[in-house]
Structure formats: structure tokens, C-alpha cells
UniProtKB/Swiss-Prot annotation:
Source taxon at top rank: Eukaryota
Recorded name of the encoding gene: cyp1
Disruption phenotype: Results in complete loss of ustilagic acid production.
Protein name (record): Cytochrome P450 monooxygenase cyp1
Assigned keywords, A-Z: Heme, Iron, Metal-binding, Monooxygenase, Oxidoreductase
Primary enzyme class: oxidoreductase
Amino acid sequence: NTHTLPGLGRLIDVSRPDWIEHVQKTNFSNYVKGEQFHDQMRDVLGDGIFTSDGERWKMQRKVASRIFTVSSFKAIITQTIREDCALVEKLIETYAKEGTVFNLQELYFKFTLSSFVKIAFSQDIMSLSEPDRPDTFGDAFNYAQKVLDMRFVQPWWKIAERFNETGRKMRAARKIVEEFTNNIVEARREESDAMGEKSKPESGRKDLLDLFMGYRSSDGQRLSNQQLKDTILNLMIAGRDTTAEALSWMSWHMLTKPEVYSRIRREIDTSLDEDGEQAGLEIDYDVFEQHTAKLSTFQETLRLHPSIPKNIRRALKDDVLPNGGPRVRKGDLMLYSDWAMARNPDIWGPDACEFKPSRWIDEETGSTVKYSQFQAHFFNGGPRLCLGQKLASYEVVQLIHHIFAKFDLELVDLGPKKSAGFDKVPDYLNSLTHP
């Protein structure tokens, strides 16, 4: 379980539920993302929640948690998602009439970016209503994430990026990303300063940016524009990439496995009215977890294709992992891979590598099975448990319901490629959030 890597030091693979629980919960304060992780991410993600530790992380999590409440779901989130689902439907309807082959994953990224920007920043970036507009931000952000991911296996990346093509493209991508966040923050700051306290009602709708702009430290200081921009980009990774990737993998499994597709279609059909019309397309937040066919397929998708397939922590002090685990020395890196754990028969049984949504359904009650957050670790665990897991789950259930109630989709021929026992596999690129 231990390795030594140049530039990184001693690395311990802790891809076991009991060891991950120790690192992420039992002895949480001893394991941090660390300065090296922060240094590799700083030029893009700054001091945001994705890269931070300690008090800085606690503050951001506390503020962000205030948007993920039941009242926010009912007042803001469900309506936004429904509106964007209708725009997705309109686009697919156009493609269907024209007989056009389209990129479903690209559409999912437009959907999650649009809905998250509306929820978090109250802005419509028109990615769905004007889909032919160049997605300069998305392309730049994707490239930046790819480079950030590569840095983990390139100890001399700082020197190399000064002179190579990757560094030149990275600087150009970073400039585009910074302009995107600058526009959001500066426009809101000007509006807030102009309106004064009138812009901060005690009641009424507040988005994530409102909450962070309203934050004051113990000495009364507000967050700087740079801190707000860091916050935006970190939340963007969580709100755009992870859900779009899960939707893509889920749809791929549905369209390549007739039994999965049929089960979801049966569930959809039972919830539509007699004419199969709009009344059955909108799912209330209070009951979305009753859609067990879609929810279990989503969970099985996340199990085999976790949004964060690998992660690390650095030990601040000496320690010993439980249940006969190795000794940990100060400075050691803990590596865990949810992707590898999902395929481990000691954790998930002899059928670990199979795509089986049924493992998430209780045969007697028909309800969803709850696994330990350190076994089903795709939403993280302990104090860093994903704040947006309910948002992502609702978003996926609602959009899949909306699309497949109206359309029969087919994959285009993927060619003869093989991987990991599958006859055909989709193309994808590495990033911080993609396996």
C-alpha cells in the first residue's frame, strides 16, 4: 500500500472504507489537502472551498450550506431546473425534426452550467436559449482543469509551463476564465454598492453570491473581489462538471443496456397522465426520491464513474491506520481512489465490475438502499460531505425524466474500440472531475 514518488514523497493507498473513514472523519484534523495541492491549483482556483483547509474552508462551507435548504429548493432550485429542462426539450425537439446527430454530453454541460449560474449568481448566460454561441468559458475551463490534473504527475510543471505550449495555452485559458468571473463579481459589486443596504433584504431570494457578499469576518471585513472570484470557480466545478459527467455516463449505460432503459421508461410511463403530457414531466422535490429506477441508476453510475475518481490528503502528524493498517509519518500523502474501490470485490462483492442498479434497491421494500458514505464514497464523506448531493440527485432525476418521457434516443456507431471488457466505449478527456 505504500509507494515513493519523486517530488511527492511517500504515498499510502488508503482505498478502503475503514481507512478513508479514519482519514476523513475519525482523525479529520490530521489530514489536509496541503500546501502542495494548493500550490498546484492556486493560479486557477485560488483559495476556494475546493483547495482550502482549516478556518478558510469552514467559513466557505458554512456560507454555502445556507443555499442548500428545503426552502431554497422549493422557492428557487426546482423552478430553475424545470425551466432549463424545458429548454433542453426544445433543443432536442429541433434536432429530432431536422434529423440531426447531436452531442448529448455537450448538451448536459450547457444545462448544468446554465442552471447552476442561475441558482448561484442569478444570471442567464444563454447557453441553452442560444446554443450556437461559442462556449469560450467552458472550453477554457475544461483545458485549465486538464492541465491542473496533469500537474500531479509532473513534479517540474512550474518550469515546464514557462516555456512549453501547455503553459502558453494555460495562460490564455486562465485569462478567459478570469474575465468570466470578473464580469459576474464586478457587476454584482457595483449593483450592491449602488443600492446599499436595500440590496440585502432580510427576506426574499438570495443566491450564493449574495450570501458570500454579505459575509463579514469577526473584525467586520467583507470578502475581496478576488475571494469572491475564487468562490465562483470552485462552486462552478461542483455545480457544472460533476453532474454533467454523471448524466453523460448514466445516459450511455441506459442506451447500451436495454434492461436499464426499459426499467426507467416503465417508471416514467407510470407518472405521466393519460395523454403522456406535461403534467407528468415535473417532479416535486418532496417526492423525487420515490423515483427509484432513475435514482438507483444514477447512484450506480456514480459508483462506477465517480465524479472525483482520485484524491489525496497529507498527514500533519504521525498516525496509525486502523484494523492492521500501516504507520503514517508526518508529511505522508494518503491516496484514495473511488474508481478503484468500486471495482474491488472485497468491497462490493464478486459482481463489483458489473453495472447493476438493483444493488441500490431493497428487494422487500422497494426503497433505495443506504450504504455507508465511506463505501459509497462518490459524494465524499465526513465533514467534507458534498453539500450539493440533493441538488445533483434532483437535477438528474428531473432531467432524465423530462428527456426520456418525450424522446427515444439512439447512440451513433462508436466504432470497434474496446476497453475494460466493453465492446464499445465513449471518448472522454481527463480533468479534475472525470475518470
